[in-house]
Design a protein with these regions (language model features):
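Conserved N-terminal segment of class I S-adenosyl-L-methionine
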Residues: 1-97, 101-105, 118, 192-195, ...
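A short His-aromatic
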Residues: 106-110
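S-adenosyl-L-methionine-dependent methyltransferase catalytic module, highlighting the catalytic core
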Residues: 14-21, 51, 112-123, 130-234
Length: 237
């Protein structure tokens, strides 16, 4: 586990989730998650720089975050004193309370066993609680184009940015949904956002905010080929 903590600190030292288009992506995912939040409590797993955390804190619900990087934890605690910050690996977290909402934004592509993490999280839900999760989609238009141009060997191959952020895999819609089904959860909603035809670098160089917003919304119409996919899941009724 020490090696995993060291790995997380290394990634945290050069993270780009709060930079450029990545920030817009996280903010749009919050807009989607906000539609489905319920109850009075939220647990966020893997907040990184805390872009999502700041938005979740603004909902007024009691917010706990669990993050394996001490550097990220210290930064969030200093910026958002109302948030309960826990420095722990997900596997070691053992809360006494249960949560109405558990948010995993860009988390499951990082962990060794995503289905096991989802199963852990399911045990921390209130009876009416929900897990809200989002990940990059291997079937995104920009990945399909990269394969055709021979820039990637396969749609689910790790690209330069995946490696930079310590991703262990790139999900497709089927493998993403399977994480929740394997954990015994019921998938209430599957969707996507961010119809992404180009790389972040190309988009940041030429696109206007209006273009970004339009293509974020278009991804909701075409989830199977959107840049990001999401699931809202709950305990079986």
């Amino acid at each position: 586990m020490d090696s995993e903590r060291e790995r997380l600190e290394r990634i945290a030292g050069n993270s780009l989730y709060a930079a450029g288009v990545n920030t817009d992506t996280v903010r749009y995912s919050f807009r989607i998650f906000a539609r489905y939040l319920r109850g009075e409590s939220i647990l966020e797993l893997g907040p990184a720089e805390g872009v999502m955390t700041e938005l979740l804190a603004g909902t007024g619900k009691a917010l706990t975050v669990v993050e394996g990087s001490r550097a990220f934890c210290d930064a969030i605690a200093a910026r958002l004193p109302s948030v309960r910050v826990v420095n722990a690996l997900f596997e070691d977290f053992a809360p006494a309370e249960r949560f109405d909402n558990i948010v995993l934004g860009h988390v499951l592509e990082h962990v060794e066993d995503p289905a096991a993490i989802v199963a852990h999280a399911a045990a921390w839900l209130t009876p009416q609680g929900r897990i809200l999760a989002a990940v990059p989609n291997s079937r995104s238009l920009h990945r399909q184009a990269a394969v055709i141009m021979k820039l990637l060997p396969a749609e689910d191959a790790l690209n330069e940015m995946d490696v930079h952020h310590g991703h262990r895999r790139v999900f497709d819609p089927e493998s993403f949904r399977q994480c929740f089904l394997a954990a015994g959860l019921a998938i209430e909603i599957f969707g996507g956002y961010w119809l992404k035809p180009l790389s972040n670098r190309q988009i940041e160089a030429t696109w206007t905010p209006q273009m970004l917003e339009a293509f974020m919304q278009l991804g909701e119409r075409y989830p199977d080929i959107a840049g990001e996919i999401y699931v809202v899941a709950a305990l079986p009724r």
